[in-house]
From Swiss-Prot:
Belongs to the globin family. Residues 2-143 form the Globin domain. O2 binds at residue 60. InterPro entries: Globin, Globin-like_sf, Globin/Proto, Hemoglobin_a-typ, Hemoglobin_oxygen_transport, Hemoglobin_pi. Signal peptide: none annotated. GO terms for cellular component: blood microparticle; haptoglobin-hemoglobin complex; hemoglobin complex. This is Hemoglobin subunit alpha-2. The keyword Repeat does not apply. CDD domains: Hb-alpha-like (cd08927). Red blood cells. Involved in oxygen transport from gills to the various peripheral tissues.
Amino acid sequence: MSLTEKDKAAVIAMWGKIHKSADAIGADALGRMLVVYPQTKTYFSHWSDLSPNSAPVKTHGKNVMSGVALAVSKIDDMTKGLMALSEQHAFQLRVDPANFKILSHCILVVIASMFPKDFTPEAHVSMDKFFCGLSLALAEKYR
């Protein structure tokens, strides 16, 4: 699913509104994912505390949103812009790429709950398309 110029503008505008809360969004989304999709805990078994408000969850949530920020900055070519992250997730971390969609959905839920007035149906569609593209870019090295 490709992003139109209108979609790109909507994503950049939404990121401008939410970026100051990115760490909180990432921590909340990752915490939700670990609770709602407990099978994802297998990737974090080396953490001593997998509870939603734990320090490792908050730290990794921040890292996730740093990746989202990178994707926003590389919105015109996320596949090329996220190649290093794709390689890391495919070859080092060995994350099932289906989990990218799961976490993307959790991020959208958190954005919608934190920014209900800004998360219009149009913004939702553009952000969903963006996260689909981001997930696809991260899965590039799995082929």
